[in-house]
Amino acid sequence: MPALACVDTSFVPPAYAFSDTAGDVFIPASSPTSAAVVVDRWSPSLSSSLYRIDGWGAPYFIANSSGNISVRPHGSETLPHQDIDLLKIVKKVTGPKSSGGLGLQLPLIVRFPDVLKNRLECLQSAFDYAIKSQGYDSHYQGVYPVKCNQDRFVVEDIVKFGSSFRFGLEAGSKPEILLAMSCLCKGSPDAFLVCNGFKDAEYISLALLGRKLALNTVIVLEQEEELDLVIELSQKMNVRPVIGLRAKLRTKHSGHFGSTSGEKGKFGLTTTQIVRVVRKLRQSGMLDCLQLLHFHIGSQIPSTSLLSDGVAEAAQLYCELVRLGAHMKVIDIGGGLGIDYDGSKSGESDLSVAYSLEEYAEAVVASVRVVCDRSSVKHPVICSESGRAIVSHHSVLIFEAVSADKPMVHQATPGDIQFLLEGNEEARANYEDLYAAVMRGDHESCLLYVDQLKQRCVEGFKEGVLSIEQLASVDGLCEWVLKAIGASDPVHTYNINLSVFTSIPDLWGIDQLFPIVPIHKLDQRPGARGILSDLTCDSDGKINKFIGGESSLPLHELDKNGSGGRYFLGMFLGGAYEEALGGVHNLFGGPSVVRVSQSDGPHSFAVTRAVPGQSSADVLRAMQHEPELMFQTLKHRAEEMMHTKGGSEGENEEEEEDDEFNNVAASLDRSFHNMPYLATEQASPSNSLSAAISNLGFYYCDEDVYDYISA
């Protein structure tokens, strides 16, 4: 059988050729050196296009001239010197304390309260403009649904930033209503506290207590039976309630997030139930308490046409309630204001929306105005529960790719493959078929014969006929053939120091996609494509779907000797729901969290609060284990083992045993105290376990005096 040096060059990629060897086997030649490869010039603007940063990131994220991602904390109003470089934040936060850093470990959530403030102001401005331009005779007064992100400082910031325009909160459970009541004590007295969700007597009593505390609570009826409790408890507590009701509209959102809409939605009252509620309130002398109509088409409403249909239907229902004698004042359009996760500005999927904030507000105001004018009904206050649109942009998850597995082609020698010609006849026949297909340039047959040869050789390996080295040679040969015909999988697997289940649960649970981008090296051309594999022992702990319909992500090669530094990736637009939904699969706890404000320092930012991620002791305690007792048990076992070694005599041996025991105890102590994630750099010396457990472990300073940790 002749060698395959004469294969048609149109069949073989330029980087490969078949060597003319002395035997009746063919093997791949080495690829040309990298010196022969022409590297195109690259720039941050090309990376911005590649990763669609100008689409999903506008106006808060850009690729700066240094090749790093910068945050524009005030959106389009951000001045050039106010941009905040994400890589500088990472270096500040993860740097050792001895060098002025905070010594925190990745993964890391970075919160930008300035972005949060800007999102609130933009939402309010959009409605204010639509109301003024259309001559609408009322105002907009939104609420933030705390379920999106219940973090104390996020909720407190929203109340503070929105106080001047009476921005309120929405709660859907008893803990959430307690949280909201406490926070709104520092907000506007006119701000709404919208009480949604399933309710029992205790929940309703809390809402009524809120009115006694001069909070503007509104009890929204999700189920007809709740009305009896509201009437009974309000009379017992001598509180005149403000009541709303949630309607099941006929308008339905067809996407994934539309399952809560339509007549079969989880929450809300049908038209029949609404009529019964009105009658019962009239009979109880409480029809004047019914003041708010609430509905929810679904999250991520894709287009203003669907939005307008739903709002118009609800506005007609609002007018009917006015006609029936209810003292209606507010129409609560619920959530649904979407964001552009993939930068496409399209209404064709759940990942994007075909409108801007301004267009959304214009559609809502116009729909309510037209219907109310037609029925000669006074324009109501417009309320929305736009959580995703408010908090998604303000938070960035940063994590590290610690290693990469890339497909390797085994460089076989003639001797490696000679066994195919000397051994099993079926294996030889499979090899000869593959040889002939390669000579013909028959790609389809190559795929078939590669599969047959591999299967035959695997059977031989299972029977003990082939060695592991021989099986590896066959695998290498087959992979090379696939690569030569363009059928191999060139995708690398990047191992990331993260748990998908803890930090990006929606990706695993509902296939929600988020923009994932390197936060640096954007001035360099990506040299590979990769998928991301997390730390968990779970096959679902991977990211192999990306925005733009891609099954892999352009990434930079990791430097093997470490001279290129660490490689950081950012997951963006995840400020809503991800933290609230995250679990502790494999006992990987929550990431470190820092709060970063724009400042006039040399690097434009200051860390105003820093919280280390959950330690191993923290997550063990969350699962009802007792870290202190576990530590003492292991320490006692170590002490026993040291004393039962035997054969040690003299002071020196005893000192060595004591030193060994102390080292073991210290190692155990550190393991409980440190985060469960990989320690990719030398960890800072830990405090004792007992001190770590009793201490909340956060750094904090008032924003007015944060210079001591300004960058």
Curated annotation (Swiss-Prot):
Q: Which CDD domains does the entry mention?
A: PLPDE_III_ADC
The protein's location, in the record's own words, is: Plastid, Chloroplast; Cytoplasm, Cytosol
For this protein, the record's InterPro entries field holds:
Ala_racemase/Decarboxylase_C, Arg_decrbxlase, De-COase2_CS, De-COase2_N, De-COase2_pyr-phos_BS, Orn/DAP/Arg_de-COase, PLP-binding_barrel
Q: What is its EC number?
A: 4.1.1.19
Q: Name one GO molecular function term.
A: arginine decarboxylase activity
The pathway noted for it is: Amine and polyamine biosynthesis; agmatine biosynthesis; agmatine from L-arginine: step 1/1
**Positions where N6-(pyridoxal phosphate)lysine occurs in the chain:** K147
Induction note: Induced by wounding, methyl jasmonate and abscisic acid (ABA). Induced by salt stress. Induced by osmotic stress. Induced by freezing. Induced by the bacterial pathogen Pseudomonas viridiflava.
Catalytic reactions of this protein: L-arginine + H(+) = agmatine + CO2
Q: List the disulfide bonds.
A: none
A Pfam family this protein belongs to? Orn_Arg_deC_N
Which residue ranges does the record annotate as region Disordered? 642-661
Please name the GO terms of the biological process aspect recorded for this protein, alphabetically.
arginine catabolic process; polyamine biosynthetic process; putrescine biosynthetic process; response to abscisic acid; response to cold; response to jasmonic acid; response to osmotic stress; response to oxidative stress
Read off the Gene3D superfamilies from this record.
Answer: 1.20.58.930, Alanine racemase, Lyase, Ornithine Decarboxylase, Chain A, domain 1
Top-level division of the source organism's lineage: Eukaryota
Recorded phenotype for the gene knockout or disruption: Increased levels of lateral root branching.
Biased composition, class Acidic residues, residue ranges: 650-661
Instruction: Cite the entry's keywords alphabetically.
Output: Chloroplast, Cytoplasm, Decarboxylase, Lyase, Magnesium, Plastid, Putrescine biosynthesis, Pyridoxal phosphate, Spermidine biosynthesis, Stress response
Similarity section: Belongs to the Orn/Lys/Arg decarboxylase class-II family. SpeA subfamily.
Describe the function of this protein.
Required for the biosynthesis of putrescine. Catalyzes the first step of polyamine (PA) biosynthesis to produce putrescine from arginine. Is a major contributor to basal arginine decarboxylase (ADC) activity and putrescine biosynthesis. Accumulation of putrescine plays a positive role in salt stress tolerance. Accumulation of putrescine plays a positive role in freezing tolerance. Production of PA is essential for normal seed development. Controls PA homeostasis which is crucial for normal plant growth and development.
Give the protein name, as stated in the record. Arginine decarboxylase 2
What organism, scientifically named, is this protein from? Arabidopsis thaliana (Mouse-ear cress)
